[in-house]
Amino acid sequence: MVKVYYNGDIKENVLAGKKVAIIGYGSQGHAHALNLKESGIDVIVGVRQGKSFTQAQEDGHQVFSVREAAAQADIIMVLLPDEQQQKVYEAEIKDELTAGKSLVFAHGFNVHFHQIVPPADVDVFLVAPKGPGHLVRRTYEQGAGVPALFAIYQDVSGEAKDTALAYAKGIGGARAGVLETTFKEETETDLFGEQAVLCGGLTALVKAGFETLTEAGYQPELAYFECLHELKLIVDLMYEEGLAGMRYSISDTAQWGDFVSGPRVVDAKVKESMKQVLTDIQNGTFAKEWIVENQVNRPRFNAINASENEHQIEKVGRQLREMMPFVKQGKKKEAVVSVAQN
């Protein structure tokens, strides 16, 4: 059974006298920095010159280059996209990691897959809120919080767990509950969820349903409504009440269709494919492919992305969403399964 920690379980004043550097000031960085600051913790921000630098200053933070922030800090939280972390770490953080400091992440990818190899004389842990930055910030302001994960990779001081929990408390996570895990478990389950269910599996399912209807002669607009637009209603019900709560809220006809047809679509073969996806994550195949793809400037990524953006479901969706003033249009990218961009 997972171990969960709350505010009352966490030692007081663990971060007193320590300086925390937030590296990156996107959605998560913004939330972490403000929440920690309002929790009475000494926070600075390390970020490149640009909009994020200016925004951090306007929010009242002391802002430095990444190297300068890392040099000053006792605790360095890296909140950059996975694919940027190794380069920034090697160029601007590594040499500032003197003995006794703590190196912190919100996702274990680069440490688990050995793209970042921390020195042996620093603590290494992760604190990962299970929600996007705007939610981490909003719930904190409301006196609540978003559940978070923490894991210890390297405990040189003997105090890494206390420090990790104190950090989680500082961003509001311990108000909701902080769950203990490992870098391996956090990384592999996060990647699997993204690939097999939340992003890869779901988008493939939606497209397959849309194509099945349109290829059978149904109007693409109706196919869009039934296979994509109405998804939010169902997901919101599952989010709030679980599968059983969702089924309670839908019609009996829909529920019966769920029972008899769902297993025909997601059958044993699909589950076997999911197991292969998990194996590729566990043995490092996916990580190697993604690392190489970034090293050669993402030719496959860019080609697939361009092709997907031209799918009929996108064209129909853009037209239909113009009829829906209640749907926010635009390019806002608030990722719920990863840390925010710098």
Curated annotation (Swiss-Prot):
**Entry cofactors:** Mg(2+)
Statement: the UniProt record of this protein carries the keyword NADP: yes
Matching entries from InterPro entries are given as:
6-PGluconate_DH-like_C_sf (IPR008927), KARI (IPR013023), KARI_C (IPR000506), KARI_N (IPR013116), KARI_prok (IPR014359), NAD(P)-bd_dom_sf (IPR036291)
Q: What is its EC number?
A: 1.1.1.86
Q: Which Gene3D superfamilies match?
A: 6.10.240.10, NAD(P)-binding Rossmann-like Domain
Question: What does the Swiss-Prot or TrEMBL cofactor note state?
Answer: Binds 2 magnesium ions per subunit.
Q: Which sites bind NADP(+)?
A: Y25, G26, S27, Q28, R48, S52, D82, E83, Q84, Q85, G133
Q: Which is one Gene Ontology cellular component term of this protein?
A: cytosol
Q: Which residue range or ranges hold the KARI C-terminal knotted domain?
A: 182-327
Entry keyword annotation includes Transcription: no
One GO MF annotation is: magnesium ion binding
What catalytic activity does the UniProt entry give for this protein? (2R)-2,3-dihydroxy-3-methylbutanoate + NADP(+) = (2S)-2-acetolactate + NADPH + H(+); (2R,3R)-2,3-dihydroxy-3-methylpentanoate + NADP(+) = (S)-2-ethyl-2-hydroxy-3-oxobutanoate + NADPH + H(+)
- Annotated Mg(2+) 1 binding sites: D190, E194
- Amino acids binding substrate: S251
Supply the alphabetized keyword list: Amino-acid biosynthesis, Branched-chain amino acid biosynthesis, Magnesium, Metal-binding, NADP, Oxidoreductase
Q: What class of enzyme is it?
A: oxidoreductase
GO biological process entries = isoleucine biosynthetic process; L-valine biosynthetic process
Outline the extent of the KARI N-terminal Rossmann domain.
2-181
Q: Where is the active site?
A: H107
Pathway(s) = Amino-acid biosynthesis; L-isoleucine biosynthesis; L-isoleucine from 2-oxobutanoate: step 2/4; Amino-acid biosynthesis; L-valine biosynthesis; L-valine from pyruvate: step 2/4
The family line of this record is: Belongs to the ketol-acid reductoisomerase family.
Reported function? Involved in the biosynthesis of branched-chain amino acids (BCAA). Catalyzes an alkyl-migration followed by a ketol-acid reduction of (S)-2-acetolactate (S2AL) to yield (R)-2,3-dihydroxy-isovalerate. In the isomerase reaction, S2AL is rearranged via a Mg-dependent methyl migration to produce 3-hydroxy-3-methyl-2-ketobutyrate (HMKB). In the reductase reaction, this 2-ketoacid undergoes a metal-dependent reduction by NADPH to yield (R)-2,3-dihydroxy-isovalerate.
- PANTHER family associated with the record: KETOL-ACID REDUCTOISOMERASE, MITOCHONDRIAL
Q: Which NCBIfam families match?
A: ilvC, PRK05479.1, PRK13403.1
Kindly provide the name given to this protein in its UniProt entry. Ketol-acid reductoisomerase (NADP(+))
Task: Identify the species of origin.
Answer: Bacillus velezensis (strain DSM 23117 / BGSC 10A6 / LMG 26770 / FZB42)
